[in-house]
Amino acid sequence: MARDVLTLSRHVLQQFSGFTPEAQDFSALMNRIALAGKMIARRLSQAGLIEGTLGVTGSVNVQGEEQQRMDDYANRAFIRALEQTGLVCRLVSEELKTPARLPENCSLSRLALLIDPLDGSSNIDANLSVGSIFSVLHPLEDRPEADNQDLLQPGRRQLAAGYILYGPSTQLVYSVGKGVHSFTLDPSLGEFILSKSDLRIPERGSVYSLNEGYFCQWSEGIQNYVRYVHRRDGYTARYSGALVADFHRILLQGGVYLYPGTRQKPEGKLRLMYEANPLAFLAEQAGGVATTGTEAILDIVPQSLHQRVPLIIGSRKNVEEVLRCLEGSLTP
């Protein structure tokens, strides 16, 4: 029997139980996020054929990182998909020092979209998977709009979160706090079609994902965790350099992803508000755990839009093993 074809927009409406104004706005917003994803997926599929797709721009972004050409394209794709729609007022991006106003005269009380437009962009020249990460927030009414203080809120207040994975197929995974659902782009239809609903992270998995090249810069607790998994059967290392791709594997198969702080940079590398928070929201919705090692990611009150944090995320039992190594109760 043929399965029902459930599109992303129809699924969002079902999540909100009807055609309420809120449901229609969210459905429209998810469609615009999906549109940006389609634009990026098309461009990536032509990488190497279109001049100016591969390589770097020669400039440095607000994070102090060399900007890839596709970083710039992906950021502009989200702006183009959302400007003049009235669905969001502010776009917070890894590539922008201050939020973009869409349009400039919009009401700041409208929703805000926070994005990493292209995570893992250094993978593109090698034709490896990359992704986009997004979070939707409603500004806090009791916080001043000046300096975007109204957006500095814990991740538990996210209205929606998700990512788009550009791999052998293009997949969009999202949650509005009612489970985690995955959609696959059907290029012939130009639609994201529901492929998996109510995803659950296995309680334990065999995969541990981290860049062991930083081993000597980590704390003794993280080093001990690596020694622990090296000395036991049942663990396998998988690390692609793209957060979305590595997290997606763990969402489906179980395990743990780690990007800890180093002795030189204890605050870590990943951005809280548009990388760690969205994935932590998905992880908890799917029965997993996300922590800095001392605090739940979703409980952190941000101090700035581009704040960085360490991240340990994945299956409950795998994360517990890491935490026990950090506290010293589990030794190699």
Curated annotation (Swiss-Prot):
Gene3D superfamilies: 3.40.190.80, Fructose-1,6-Bisphosphatase, subunit A, domain 1. Keywords: Calvin cycle, Carbohydrate metabolism, Cytoplasm, Hydrolase, Magnesium, Metal-binding. Coiled coil: none annotated. Pathway: Carbohydrate biosynthesis; Calvin cycle. It comes from the Bacteria. Its cofactor is Mg(2+). GO terms for cellular component: cytosol. It is an enzyme of class 3 (hydrolase). Binds 2 magnesium ions per subunit. It holds the Pfam family FBPase_C. Mg(2+) 2 binds at D116, D119, E275. Mg(2+) 1 binds at E94, D116, L118. Substrate binds at D119, G120, S121, S122, N211, Y239, Y257, L258, Y259, K269. InterPro entries: FBPase_C_dom, FBPase_class-1, FBPase_N, FBPtase. GO terms for molecular function: fructose 1,6-bisphosphate 1-phosphatase activity; magnesium ion binding. It is found in: Cytoplasm. GO terms for biological process: fructose 1,6-bisphosphate metabolic process; fructose 6-phosphate metabolic process; fructose metabolic process; gluconeogenesis; reductive pentose-phosphate cycle; sucrose biosynthetic process. Homotetramer. PANTHER family: FRUCTOSE-1,6-BISPHOSPHATASE-RELATED, SEDOHEPTULOSE-1,7-BISPHOSPHATASE, CHLOROPLASTIC. This is Fructose-1,6-bisphosphatase class 1. The lineage of its organism: Bacteria, Bacillati, Cyanobacteriota, Cyanophyceae, Synechococcales. The gene is fbp.
